[in-house]
Amino acid sequence: MESQQLSQHPHISHGSACASVTSKEVHTNQDPLDVSASKTEECEKASTKANSQQTTTPASSAVPENPHHASPQPASVPPPQNGPYPQQCMMTQNQANPSGWSFYGHPSMIPYTPYQMSPMYFPPGPQSQFPQYPSSVGTPLSTPSPESGNTFTDSSSADSDMTSTKKYVRPPPMLTSPNDFPNWVKTYIKFLQNSNLGGIIPTVNGKPVRQITDDELTFLYNTFQIFAPSQFLPTWVKDILSVDYTDIMKILSKSIEKMQSDTQEANDIVTLANLQYNGSTPADAFETKVTNIIDRLNNNGIHINNKVACQLIMRGLSGEYKFLRYTRHRHLNMTVAELFLDIHAIYEEQQGSRNSKPNYRRNLSDEKNDSRSYTNTTKPKVIARNPQKTNNSKSKTARAHNVSTSNNSPSTDNDSISKSTTEPIQLNNKHDLHLRPGTY
C-alpha cells in the first residue's frame, strides 16, 4: 500500500525527505547546504528505489503541488537598525533628494526625524517640477526676494544656480532651548532668504510677497522640524502645531510680529531715557508722546512707575522748565499727571508773554516812524537859517561902515564910542569861549 502511494507521488516523498533534513539542520544551527556525503547518498538511493517501483502514468496527468513544500534556503537575517529611529520613519535617498531640492540648499544627508505629535509628511517624488527663482544670497532680513512669477529657467542656468546655492547657503543652528527660539528663528528666516525663498516670508502686514507652493511648503516643514526639535519649542509654537502641524507660515508670521514688538520696546525705552523738552513744542503734544510710550511699555510687561517716569521726564527738562527739578524733587508721591500740570502752567505763561511781544515791537516801530517824520520837518529849518546868517552879516557890515564914518567926524564919533563902551557887547560864541578881563 505504501509502495503504491510512493509510486503515485514520487515528488512528495523526495520533498518530505529533504524537508526533514533541512529542518533538522536548521535547528542544529548548521548550514543547510553543508550536507555530509553519506546522507546525500542515502537520499539518492531512496529516490532511485521509488522511481524503480513507480508505475507508468499518463503524460497528461498533472501532479498537484504541495503547499507545505519547503525548499532548502538560508535563514533570513533582519537588516540592522540605523540609529534610534525605526526604519519606517527614515526617508529614503530618493525621497530626500527630489528633483530641484538641492537648489534650495536642502541638507539631504540629514535624516528627517518626525514630530511625535504628527505623522510624517514626505516630500513629493521626482515627477514634480520646480520653478526656478533668481539667486539672492546674503540678503538682509528686511529685504524680500524679488517675485519671479511662474517662469522657468533652462537646465544650464538651473545647474549653475544650484552649484552657487550649495556653495553659499549655510543651514541654521540646532535649537537647544525654548528661550533661544527668538534668536534661532532669525537665523532660520535668513536661511530661507539665502535659499531664494524670501518671497514666501510674511512681511510687516503679515502677508507674503507671493503664494507658497506645495513643494516649498514641504521643504519648509522638513527643515523646520530638523533644526527645531519639538521638545525645545516654546508653548505658543506647540499650540499652533497642535492645530495644524504643517502651518509653519503662521509660526513665522507670529515670530516677525514679536520681533517688531521687541524692537518697538527697545525704541520706547531709548526714547524715554533721552527725553528733551524746552517749550519749543506744545505741552499737549509732549504729554501725549510720553504717556503713549509709558502705556505701551506697561502693556508689554515693562512696568514704569510714577517715580521712575517723573525722574526721566525732569531729567530732560531745560530752559524755564529746569527749575521743576528742584521744586518737585522733594515730593516722593508725585505723579506724572501732577508734573505735567506744572509743565502746562509754564508753557501757558510763555505763550502769554510771547503774544504781548508783538504789540511792544509795533510801538517801537511807530516811534521810529515818528522820529523819521520829525527829522523831515527840521530840514526846512536848516534852510531858513541862511537868510538869518545873511542878515547878521549885513548888520556887521553896516556897523563897520558906521564905525568908519564915525572916524571922519570926531565929535560924533566920541559920543558913539562912549556910548558903545557902556553898552554890552553880544558875541555869537558857538564854541563857548570866554575872554579874560583886561584883554580888551
Swiss-Prot record:
Q: For bias kind Polar residues, which ranges apply? A: 1-10, 48-60, 127-152, 419-428
- Keywords for this protein: Cytoplasm, Phosphoprotein, RNA-binding, Transposable element
Its source organism is Saccharomyces cerevisiae (strain ATCC 204508 / S288c)
Q: Which stretches does UniProt call biased (Basic and acidic residues)? A: 429-440
Functional description taken from the UniProt entry: Capsid protein (CA) is the structural component of the virus-like particle (VLP), forming the shell that encapsulates the retrotransposons dimeric RNA genome. The particles are assembled from trimer-clustered units and there are holes in the capsid shells that allow for the diffusion of macromolecules. CA also has nucleocapsid-like chaperone activity, promoting primer tRNA(i)-Met annealing to the multipartite primer-binding site (PBS), dimerization of Ty1 RNA and initiation of reverse transcription.
Claim: Cytoplasm is one of the keywords in the record? yes
Gene Ontology terms for molecular function? RNA binding
Q: List the InterPro entries.
A: TYA
> Source gene?
TY1A-LR4
**How does this chain assemble?**
Homotrimer.
Q: What is the recorded name of this protein? A: Transposon Ty1-LR4 Gag polyprotein
Per the UniProt entry, what are the Gene Ontology biological process annotations, in alphabetical order? viral translational frameshifting
Record's note on what induces expression: Ty1-LR4 is a highly expressed element. Induced under amino acid starvation conditions by GCN4.
Instruction: Cite the source lineage.
Output: Eukaryota, Fungi, Dikarya, Ascomycota, Saccharomycotina
Residues with site note (Cleavage): 401-402
Ranges for region Disordered: 1-93, 126-173, 352-440
Q: What is known of its domains?
A: The C-terminal RNA-binding region of CA is sufficient for all its nucleocapsid-like chaperone activities.
Which Pfam families would you find in this protein's record? TYA
